[in-house]
Every structure is written in C-alpha cells, then in structure tokens.
Amino acid sequence: RRSSDLELADECHKQGIRLHLYYSHIDWYREDAPWGRTGRGTGRPNPKGDWNSYYKFMNNQLTELLTNYGKIGAIWFDGWWDQDQNPDFDWQLPGQYAMIHRLQPACLVGNNHHQAPFAGEDIQIFERDLPGENRAGLSGQDISALPLETCETMNGMWGYKITDQDYKSTKTLIHYLVKAAGKDANLLMNIGPQPDGELPAVALERLAEVGEWMKVYGETIYGTRGGCIAPHPWGVTTQRENKLYVHILELQDKALFLPLEGKKVRKAVGYADRLPVKFRKCEGGVMLYLPEVPTDIDKVIEVDIEK
C-alpha cells in the first residue's frame, strides 16, 4: 500500500530538506478522544471518551512516525487549547515529549498552546503574530530564551476554502518574513492545499515572487540573527558577525538614526547596488544619509561594524 507520508519523507531526505510534522492533539472522529470545546457535532457518542486508549493511540502513531520515516526535524503539536476550559485536564505531555526525545534525540518539540513554554519543549511558537506582539489575541505569552517561531497563513484560513481569496500581498509577506528575522524568529508560512492536492495558483505566484526577492536578499535573512538594533517603526535589523543589515520598511525621510552607541562603523553601502551610503557619527549612534526617500519593499543597507 502506498504511503504519502513515506513518499514525502523520502523526497525531503533526497532534497536535503528537514521534515517537520504537524500533530494534532485533537481528534474529532475517534470515539476515545475526549470532547473539548471544538468538534462537538461530529457524531462521537461519549463526551468523556477513553483517555488511556486515546493517549496510547497517539503515542503509537508518534512512535511509527519517529521510527519508520527517517530523521524527523520536529514534531509541531497543536490543540492543547481545546481543553482550556477544563483546567484539570492533563494531556500528559512530559511522558510524550520524553518518548519523542528518546526515539530521536535531535527531534525538536514545539507546541502551539499559546502559553509560555512547557518543560521538554525546544521551540516557542507564536500564532499569527510576531514575538512580543498580540494583535490576533493568540500570542500574549512572554518571550522565552528558546528559539522562536511565528506561524501565519497566506490568506485567512489554515485549510483550503474556495471563497477565501484574500491572499496577502507579496509586500506584506516579505515584510512579515523580514520582521520575523529581525525578531530572531523562524517564519512558518501556511498554505491550504486544494482538494486535489495542488497548491492554489495565487499561492504559488506569491511564493515565486518572494523567492525572486530572496534571490537578491537571501543573505540578509538566511543564517542571520536579530541585529544589535531592536525593531523600530521604520524596520528591523539582522546581523551576521560584523555585518549589520538594516531593513528599512517604512521611512518617509532620507535620514535615519541608528542607535549604535559604543560601536564604530567602518562603511555603509546599499546591499543591492553596493553604492556607498553617507553616514556620520553623532550622539548615541550613527546617522545614515540616503540619496532619496526609500520606495523599495525593503531598502537594505549593509553596515560594516568594527569588531
């Protein structure tokens, strides 16, 4: 019998892509899965379910995934929040996390529970918001010391909905990617596949356009960390060793102050055109003088800082 999961895993390994797997703690169809606040109209007869049976089922599935599909980069859990109106409910996560790390010690564990990280988790997830923001009302938790990730969807839905054509613009997607990098976070961008398994044409178009931008500016994103300058209304910074990439996203001026007190700037150039950018040291940092008000989706200035 064909296994689409196995075919996907094999192709990822062939292409050098780390395979991360989404795993829902919620199941709206198994009769042993306890009812939460969602999925109550799916025909399950017993609201209490049979937790021991369901927990064993989940762990058996996870064991299969972590045993038969090669190296797995991460297990990305979702659904803890389904029991948030039942404070006494115990998902028994420590045992599940320990099992994952025992089967594959290098496999990361993340959980989209909208809380501060629990023991045994390796990444902190923020849903539909950048770390430290809470515009969608799902990510009010404090930022931890763990590696960060923000997940967002390209239109309005996580799954496919034919009437949802409100896809984010290429500019919006690039800005979200850049801001995530500037906040030291990975970006997980969701696309709901069509019933036939194909990705929507407009989503592929957006991916191609972001890809074209990344061909030029990828070095300012891949392998960088959030820069030594905190995010500002004008944009963010990313950094690799002594190179600071200033991502100017919203600026209605030709001058930009960079709070680089105590740091010596050796030179500044436009990242794409490599043309010198004038600067001068001033109180508290450095002032950049751009040739014109930026109109690019992301005007990137490369600043060389003396170590």
Predicted regions and their residues:
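Mature catalytic domains of secreted/periplasmic carbohydrate-active enzymes
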Residues: 1-307
